[in-house]
Amino acid sequence: MSDESAREVDKQLRLRVCVLSELQKTERDYVGTLEFLVSAFLHRMNQCAAAKVDKNVTEETVKMLFSNIEEILIVHKEFLKVVEECLYPEPSAQQEVGACFLHFKDKFRIYDEYCSNHEKAQKLLLELNKIRTIRTFLLNCMLLGGRKNTDVPLEGYLVTPIQRICKYPLLLKELLKRTPRRHSDYTAVMEALQAMKAVCSNINEAKRQMEKLEVLEEWQAHIEGWEGSNITDTCTEMLMCGVLMKISSGNIQERVFFLFDNLLVYCKRKHRRLKNSKASTDGYRYVFRGRINTEVMEVENVDDGTADFHSSGHIVVNGWKIHNTAKNKWFVCMAKSPEEKHEWFEAILKERERRKGLKLGMEQDTWVMISEQGEKLYKMMCKQGNLIKDRKRKLTTFPKCFLGSEFVSWLLEIGEIHRPEEGVHLGQALLENGIIHHVTDKHQFKPEQMLYRFRYDDGTFYPRSEMQDVISKGVRLYCRLHSLFTPVVRDKDYHLRTYKSVVMANKLIDWLIAQGDCRTREEAMIFAVGLCDNGFMHHVLEKSEFKDEPLLFRFFADEEMEGSNMKHRLMKHDLKVVENVIAKSLLIKSNEGSYGFGLEDKNKVPIIKLVEKGSNAEMAGMEVGKKIFAINGDLVFLRPFPEVDCFLKSCLNSRKPLRVLVSTKPRETVKIPDSADGLGFQIRGFGPSVVHAVGRGTVAAAAGLHPGQCIIKVNGINVSKETHASVIAHVTACRKYKRPMKQDSIQWVYDSLESAQEDIQKSHSKPPGDGAGDAFECKVEDVIDKFNTMAIIDGKKEHVSLTVDNVHLEYGVVYEYDSTAGTKCNVVEKMVEPKGFFSLTAKILEALAKSDEHFVQNCTSLNSLNEVIATDLQSKFTSMCSERIEHVCHRISSYGRFSRVLKNRAWPTFKQAKPKISPLHSSDFCPTNCHVNVMEVSYPKTSTSLGSAFGVQLDSRKHNSHDKENKSVEPGKLSPMVYIQHTITTMAAPSGLSLGHKDGHGLQYLLKEEDLETQDIYHKLLGKLQTALKEVEMSVCQIDDLLSSITYSPKLERKTTECVTPMDSDNEKGERNSKRVCFNVAGDEQEDSGHDTVSNRDSYSDCNSNRNSIASFTSICSSQCSSYFHSDEMDSGDELPISVRISHDKQDKIHTCLEQLFSQIDSIINLLKGQAVIRAFEQTKYLTPGRGLQEFQQEMEAKLSCPRRLRLHLKQDPWNLPSSIQALAQSIRKHAEEVKCRILLALLEYSDSETQLRRDMVFCQSLVATVCAFSEQLMAALNQMFDNSKENEMETCEASRRWLDQIANAGVLFHFQSLLSPNLKDEQAMLEDTLVALFDLEKVSFFFKPSEEDPLVANVPLTYQVEGSRQALKVYFYMDSYHFEQLPQRLKNGGGFKIHPVLFSQALESMEGYCYRDNISVEEFQAQINTASLEKVKQYNQKLRAFYLDKSNSPPNTTSKAAYIDKLMKPLNALDELYRLITSFIRSKRIAACVNTPCSASGVGLLSVSSELCDRLGACHIIMCSSGVHRCTLSVTLEQTITLARSHGLPPRYIMQAMDVMRKQGARVQNTAKNLGVRDRTPQSAPRLYKLCEPPPPVGEE
């Protein structure tokens, strides 16, 4: 034998030893796995089934899951024993194993049963995993067995036997390959290979698995120079392969890439130069070049045209980056086409989601299970008494700890575990999950004499959502650090190099301690390490963990935005724009099992194919050919069409109204064909004219004309500035007949509810035949023309062409990003103009005008003061009153005029910011630039939304969140999705600047706080007095009616009433149980309970009862009557009643009436003695020098001592009781009227015309914005899309219902955020105006009513009505029955709730050194506002706590009640840290001595923290600046980005990048376009967080 042959044989024999070693090792592992399955799962489940602990775990269930696994274990124990005997003491080249397989080939047939049952077992396990108790039980089995459950789930263990039986042919094939033909084992191995193939072939499942593995093995055989473990060890299938260009180390090379589950391999194609070469005979096709485990692989998109460090300056097209995080190596791949790039990304996403989805869910389940088990064990150990106690160790006492050995022994004792090693596994799991820890944190769990402590006992236990808590704190910290006027994060020169946006580790720890975030340096370091672990920051050179040393660390988010000479800078765009949207929202109700439209798939996008004539879809504005973006929050344009169809069917089955986002254009041309039935629309107004109404099913509706559209051109001629008559002339120019005869049959759809109501009233009030009289009136708002003219085509034109501008457009952007949980998140950001904006303002003005009218009517009683006013002052009094009342009347007429104008205003649909102040106009009562910023987030529903902060970043645009086109949708089933809507309203701060003021101040400066309160007190007192006097009048009337029936004859009663006396039996009964008195009550009075007067005296109902004063009334009357009847003084001519008997119920009736009257009079007396009356007399004493408070009170005391006087009347002269009561009522009325007049006089003095007008103006602005903001959040909750905190592990439907219950009981919190700079005069005045406006808002209440079923206005889910006065304004929300039924019962029954506005104000620049007034600094002014608001937030929080702790609102079961309350209280318990931060911010502004210390460096951090605080309490958010444009845009974008990072898994590293994209490309760009003349007043010194992210300057210009 030649040397070369000998060397080859030696090599083969060495490899044979390797194969034998692998066979032995893997067989041992396999037997261990089987033993684990049997001991950890099978035995425990059998015990559970026998004990019947859970109805879902039965003997049949266990048998189905594990089949004959115990028999397989027995066989393989024998097989392993035989193999080890053959390979004893260790594998060598000459040993033989082929005979082992041949001996066991028949016994391996046992796998047939197991493999045939496997599919059923997997389905059963899938169902069992949906049951929480079973899932927890299985996790516990895994834990006690000592396995890391998130590495391999139970599903993986159950498939192991099939994988093993399929592995034998591959091992034997490799062994045969390495066994020389002359070897004694060669024949046996060959026969064993054939035998094992036969075994696998007879098992279907095993055959499929084996075929897959053979394909992979064959593929690997074609790779030359393969490195690492075999492909079949870690992978089961190839997902994608193709040729890509690879750029690394400056070289561009063509490489063949193969993507498997768990592995990416890239090779060089092998070129065959000679046909008969060795390579050809070996069959090598590729040369191995590298492999990356997908677990440590990140993929990042590269925009076309990019040339950066990783591409070595080469321009990248259709490319992406791959980062091997294990080796920290990068390379760039380029595909040949965008389609190929998309396919690769789709495959990568699919592989990642498959691998990570289950693992993340199991991590979350494990955390929940271990937390609950730890809590249970802790309580049991505490009850035990001698396990947890103070223990001494080396002269040190460790409180509340236990020994590891005692813990394991105790677990065995109570039956929690069956073997000591299970106790060790459980203890280690408790330690790893933060439930227990070693007292000095030096050891893992050991069953020895080591001390451990539950973290509950030393305050180091973190709540269940620990990951989310770190994310929330990290986002909060990042925002605070970047909100400072003196930055902590800044550029730093270090070792001859400048590092951008860095912070020293030890300085960050100093700052955290100074701010109070951490108490010790150790605690601060643990927090900072957590931030590094969760992807917030890292060492600038990736060379160190976080330590309390002068090391430089940078936030990833800063790195993303810094230019990019950074070596490890990641991708530029993670939050990617998928689509820009110009659309309108339609509301479509189902009707008779149909929505009235059909869709078709055109270019993979749902397009409206047909719209049924006269249907709800046509009424809403559906047009054929339009693209649909979203339905009920679901982005259907990203779904495959079969899924869209399935989604619509599910909506129809649930009878849900559809909220459809359909594409449109700002300006469209509508061609309306002539029709004998008319054109079918109405127009109104001019400059431009507006489509007032469209008939359902008419040609106009079919052509796509909608109410509210503005007519710009008619038949190509511009009529935007023409008169109404001119527009009509243009429309009717080609028509021969003026009007059709069939107008009454058309069902009109109007542009607003007011227009509809007005039109209906006109049509009802119009006499017959008067059809053409009102078409051309001079007032714009009254001009309506119904010209459904009959069309006879003249051959010239077959249609009327209208170019119209659409209204209520929604400008939006659809984004996508890959969340930390590994799911694709879609975000729709829209900026919406509120609907019903101007009409709501009009209704508020009408309510204010009615309130003024009522005030003027009351003022007519002022003349009654003439008798107490001095003669020489009467003329002054009269002129003052008439002058003030004239001002109020002028205001009433102005409000009426403004209301009419606003009701008919149609264009533009919002109020723009004015660059200059203009004279008073109706629009001054509307909020400026009021927009609702809507952000809708949707993503697949998984068991958890958390995950690593390092995610895959994809750029597969709109179809990468779904499977490929050929993916089939199971009929009737869709993967569940999460839909959440967040809303923030923006506006210019309420302002009355159009009225001007000589000092330039606002209302809070002009109106003293005590004056504001006094006016309120006066108005409330006035209302109470009026109500109380009415009640007195009603009580007196009742008593008069009762007493007037005395001495009436029963005969007369029978004549005058139908049923006057009771039946005979009742008479007899009454006679037996009655006393003889002087009163006879008519029968119809007996039906009256005496309580029919609704009393509203809650403010003065604390007076003492007067029942004692009339307790003996019956006996008094009886005795007095008796003496009267038998008196000699009785005139013989006096006629006595025939029946003078009265029953007990009639006596009780009189008792009740008198008691009620006495209580009412006492209440009025208490009111007349109150502080408000004293203040009113003090204010008006200059007009009545002869009659002051003392005289009034003396006179009142003399005349109104009612209980004593009336008791005297009853004893002495009961027959004169009616006159006494009348006299008493007149006296009380006289005194009350005098007080009323004085109050009215005082109010007239307060009623400065200009000040009240300004107050109404800012109140209207704030109330309109408040109603619009609440409406959007209310609809989100009713549509089950509201969720203010995803970290509470609550379904959106439950979170929505909880919020509705919350507002129904505690009211709704409104968070107003002011970005105004009070150092500027005009913005200071706006802030002062806003404070008064919010003071008035506290008097507003919200109520709800169902609307009419058949709406006259399309796409308006809510309409409003306003009633009441300035002191108690009620806003009624009318909604359709579907949404109304979802309201809490209290609201459906007519109950309402108050609104709780709070204002947090912080300028975006330092206010240090600016003075406000009276030696008060601007900083102190802001601090006062914020302190008061924080106190109100705390009060609201207390209301919520009280509501949640109310036993009546929780489940009846004690256990579930505790869990329910804990679930509700969790978000509230997390607020303490936010309270502390805001308090420290406010305090730091106030302490002048600390200006230069770290504790004062809060910057504008108050804004984001106060917003988070209110958001956690379910508040509605309104952000204000001077114009509602620039600063509002910055703040809204920041808040939305924070929400995405905190609640929806946006990787923290992309916070700044996401803000930059949303600011520069988002929906609010349109707001700037709509306000081109408005100056940007954002301070230049604003912190970085509130500045637009600018690109870095070129190199050399820094």
UniProtKB/Swiss-Prot annotation:
The keyword Phosphoprotein does not apply. SMART domains: DEP, PDZ, PH, RhoGEF. SUPFAM superfamilies: DBL homology domain (DH-domain), PDZ domain-like, PH domain-like, Winged helix' DNA-binding domain. It comes from the Eukaryota. It holds the Pfam family SOS1_NGEF_PH. Residues 382-456, 483-558 form the DEP domain. Keywords: Guanine-nucleotide releasing factor, Repeat. Interacts with RAC1. This is Phosphatidylinositol 3,4,5-trisphosphate-dependent Rac exchanger 2 protein. It comes from Mus musculus. The lineage of its organism: Eukaryota, Metazoa, Chordata, Craniata, Vertebrata.
